[in-house]
Amino acid sequence: MNTKYIFVTGGVASSLGKGIIAASLAKLLQARGLRVTIQKFDPYINIDPGTLNPYEHGECYVTEDGAETDLDLGHYERFLGIHTSKANNVTTGKIYHTVITKEREGAYLGKTVQIVPHITDEIKRRMLLLGKTGDYDVIITEVGGTVGDIESQPFIEAMRQLQWELPEEDFLSIHLTLIPYLKAAQELKTKPTQHSVQELQALGVHPDIIVCRTEKELSPELRHKIALFCNVKPGHVIQSIDAWSIYQVPLNMEAENLGKMVVDKLEIPGLPEPDLEALKAFLERLKHPLQEVDIALVGKYVELQDAYKSIQESFVHAGAANSCKVRVHTLQAENINDGNADEVLGKMDGILVAPGFGERGLEGKISAVKYARTHNVPFFGICLGMQMAVVEFARNVLGYAEAASTEVNPRTPHPVIDLMEDQKSTTIKGGTMRLGAYKCRLAEGSLARSIYGTEEIAERHRHRYEFNNAYLRQMQEAGLKVSGVNPDTGLVEIVEIPSHPFFIATQFHPEYKSTPEHPQPLFVHFVKACMDKR
């Protein structure tokens, strides 16, 4: 069987959920026994989102091989239970960088380098790259942005060319659009969808399936109208109605026959019925919790829901594993201090101090750590959260009042957190941190060892600063146990306080590897500790 290529575009408005639709379709195909992966093509000129402020584009998701990518890759991994890679996220910046580098090397033999064919050829090469590995039956490509945007036009043109170049049964186009509901008229309006599809068709791409985001059910008459004016088969207009959980969307799409439509169009015979029992069992646990807990997520980007997307989703997975509803309260670190910590955090069953960069909000994070440590509240720190746990311990237990990270105070007399040695000569910011999966050896008898149930793990990282091993002996003697280290470098990966009911912090990002079917163990045990406290 030839590799099949599916493209998902969006129209009318942004943030309709192309990534969720792409991941849901991938889940339906995977459940039929097909080998599927998804790739995201982003039309911004940044090489990757690694240097983007989370307020700009949400969370930066890190893959096993160290790629800093769009948060949609997190959805892909969580829905499918697979690992993505650098090849799964392509930006305009990467495309132009490759083409300009080739031009400087003389690869184009003196030709005038243009959008068409040189940029579009490179886009097509990347679109087909994963399909040529032989590892996948189906490649789903999500094209970022909205049809009509100037920056996405080269990607649409590359799609148009592939639609013409590939066999008809190997190419499928899905267009996600919005059907707004006018409350005053009590009517769903199809005109924006008609215009969006017409614009896509004017660019030479003809969608095979139209998925309509809507608050209300689409009547058969409305579906027929959309099909008629958008030139698709009557049965190929389907609805994506607002769901109570994103993990319900694959089941909704299966009920709309999306999986069957795609398999039929791509002419893939002999597939079994989809096996979605594990997903249904997860949703059943999620929908019927036996207990509830309140957990504070203390961070500096809390105003944007997507800034801590993987952490939020990890709590969903861990909650279902414990048959517990986790209410996550996102708290702005800048608003927390020693004086109001009891008022702000007193009703919480657990405290998680989130990752981040820079000075803003650090003292608030330290106050949150102190409150959790001194009031026996279950605590979980991630990356910067772990570093601030170390700073708080140094200040308030070791008595080093001026202890700090050199990230914010290069002249501190007690640099308990310091720049990694191999980072000290680095001047380029993008893609130069310690990124991707690294090994961590867990100490015998530690909380971390009991949680993971194994001696060695591998988790993903994204940081420049580390625990300063010059303070290792003093910290351990005072009660802060180092329970996880990198076996190759000795870099401290996990700290915990054995005398505390549950106090653990990691330099790595465990949230990147949590899925509904395999919830991350640290999150599962943290939620369990919060339940026990309550």
Features from the language model and the residues they span:
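Extended hydrophobic-aromatic, low-complexity segments
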Residues: 304-307, 320-324, 338-341, 360-364, ...
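Cysteine-nucleophile active-site neighborhood
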Residues: 16-19, 23-27, 31, 344-439, ...
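Active-site glycine-centered loops adjacent to acidic/histidine catalytic or metal-binding residues
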Residues: 42, 383, 394, 463, ...
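Flexible phosphate-sensing "switch/lid" loops adjacent to ATP/NTP-binding sites
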Residues: 1-324, 333-350, 357-358, 365-371, ...
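Short beta-alpha connecting loops at secondary-structure transitions
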Residues: 56-64, 243-247, 353, 374-380, ...
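Beta-strand->loop->alpha-helix junctions that form or flank phosphate-binding loops
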Residues: 236-241, 329, 408, 485-488
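C-terminal and late-domain segments of enzyme folds
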Residues: 435, 439, 443-534
